[in-house]
Amino acid sequence: MTKFKIAAVVFILLSVSNLFAQNRQNSTVPADNAKDNSVAADTDNQKASSVDYLMGGVFGAVTIDGKNYQQIGLRPEIKLWKLGIGLDLNILLDENGKIREEDWNEKMDYLDKVYFISWGKKGEPFYFKFGGLDSTTLGYGAIMRGYTNLLEYPTYKRQGLELSVDTTYTGMEIAVNNFKELAGRNSAVMGGGRVYVKPFSRLQIGGSFAGDLNEYKGLRDTDDDGYPDEVDMYPDNDDYVTQRDYYRKKLLDSGMSSAAVDAMLEDLSDAGLISTLEKGDLRNYSDERSRTGFWGVDAGLKLVDSDFFDLDIYSQFSKSLNTDGWGFTAPGIRITAGSIFEIYADYRQQSDEFIFGYYNDTYDLERAKYVDDGSGNLYVVTKKDKLKAAIASRGYMAGMKLNFFNFITGKAEYQDMNWGKEEEINDKSLKGELALNQNVLPLVSKAKAYYVQNNVEKIQWKTESTVMGGVFGLGVAEGVSIDFNYFITFEDKNGDGKIAGDDERITNVSVSTNSIF
C-alpha cells in the first residue's frame, strides 16, 4: 500500500508539471530562489500571469543516520499571486534497491513532504511562512537572532512558523521552531513573539518574549520511548532499549525460566557478547523538562528615510526568566544604501548568566547534547548550562551585508564581549557567508561558502558551535546542474574541551543532480 501511495504522488506531480509546462511562456522562474523560498514572477510578466511554477529534481547519493541511499527527489514550487507552496518528495533506495518506507508509513511523514507554505515576503504588511525557516529574528535580535530550523536538513526536517503583521500604528512578529515536537510524549516547542507600536511615523517601540518549553527536545528520540537515540540500542523499537532488554524478552518468549534467563545474560555479558547495561541505568526523559525564557523591550528611531539611504538608531534590553541575568544595547546604529549594502553596529553590556541572541543559528546543535565524561559515561548538557556559566561583560557587535551588482553577495558579523576583562570569556562570535551568483562564471551554476561560530572564548577554526560548509554547482546543460554540498559540524565527544581527531568531526557530503523541468 505504501508503494502505491508513493507512486500515485509522483504520478500526480509529473502530470501537474506537464500541465504547467504547456503554459509556461506566460511566466518566468528564477534559477535560484533559495533566499525567500518562493518563486518570484518576472516583473514584466506579472500582469500577464499571476501563476509561477517550478519543478526541480534531485538525484544522487545521500547519507541519513549513517546509512547510504540513492535519492530520487521531486521539488515542485508554485506561486499563485502571493501564495507560495513548496514540496520536498524524496524516494530513498537502499543498497538492495528497496524504498526506505519509514519515510512514508506514518501520518507525520506526509507533513515532512511540505517544504514551505508562504504568503507574501518579509517586510510586507502581512507575511506568513510554514515549514523550513532560513533566518528568523525578533526585533533587533537580543533574544532570537538568525534562528534557522534547517541546520540538519534533510537528515532531520522541522516544520516551523514565521509570521509578521505591520500596520500604520502597530505590528507583531511570531516564530515557532517545530510543530512536530508537539506530537508524542512530553510535547513542547521553542518559539517567541514581539508586538510593537509606532506612536510616530519614524519611532517604533516593541516588547518581546521567547522561550523553550523543553530543551531536552534537542535529544533525538525516534521511537518516543523517553530514551534518546544516542543511548538507545534499538532507536526504532520502543520495546527495547538495551541489549539485555532484547535478549531477556526473546529468551523468556522461548519458554526459559527467569532464573535461567538471568544466568544466561550474565554468561553473555561475561563473554563480552552483550553489554552489561540495563534500562534502569539510563535516564528516561519522558517526563523531564528543562525550560528557558526571556523577555525584552526595544525602541528604534529612523533618522533618515529616503529611497537610496536609510539611517536608524536603536536600543534594546532583555532579561532571562531563569537566571535574572540581563543585557542591553545602546546605542545601536544601522545604515542601509538600497540593496547595495547594510552596515550595523552596537555597544552592548550584560550581567552574569546572560547570553545575547540566545536562540541563534546554531541553537539546534546546542539545545541539548550528550557529552562523554572521559571514562565512557555519557551525560546531557543543555544550553541553559552555558547560560548559567556566562559572566558579566561588555563589548560590541558589528556586521555588514553586501550586494555587488548582483554578481557577488556576502555578509559578515562579529561580536566581542571582552572589553574591560583581563581574562578571556566565552562570548565571541563570528559569522560569514559569500555567494557567487549565477552566470558570473561559465559552467558555474552556484557557489557559496559559509562559516558560523557562536559564543566561544577564542575564535578557533573548530569548536562545538562551529558550522561550516559550501555548495558548488557545475552546470552541465541548460536547466541541469551537478551540485556538491559540504556540511561540517564538530562534537566534543570526550568532554575535554577540545576538538581533535576525525571522530569529533561530523562531515556530510552529498553529490546530486538538480534539474528544472
What kind of region is each of these model predictions?
Residues 1-7:
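Bacterial N-terminal signal peptides that target proteins for export
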Residues 8-18:
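Bacterial N-terminal signal peptides
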Residues 23-73:
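Short glycine/proline- and aromatic-enriched beta-strand/turn motifs that initiate or cap beta-hairpins
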Residues 50-52, 67, 84, 109, ...:
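Signature for the C-terminal beta-barrel architecture of outer-membrane proteins
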Residues 85-116, 141-143:
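Surface-exposed loop and membrane-interface regions of Gram-negative outer-membrane beta-barrel proteins
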Residues 117, 434, 503-517:
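Outer-membrane beta-barrel "beta-signal"
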Residues 131, 135-137, 156-158:
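Hydrophobic alpha-helical hairpins/lids featuring a short glycine-rich hinge
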Residues 444-450, 467-487, 512-514:
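Conserved C-terminal beta-signal and adjacent last beta-strands/turns
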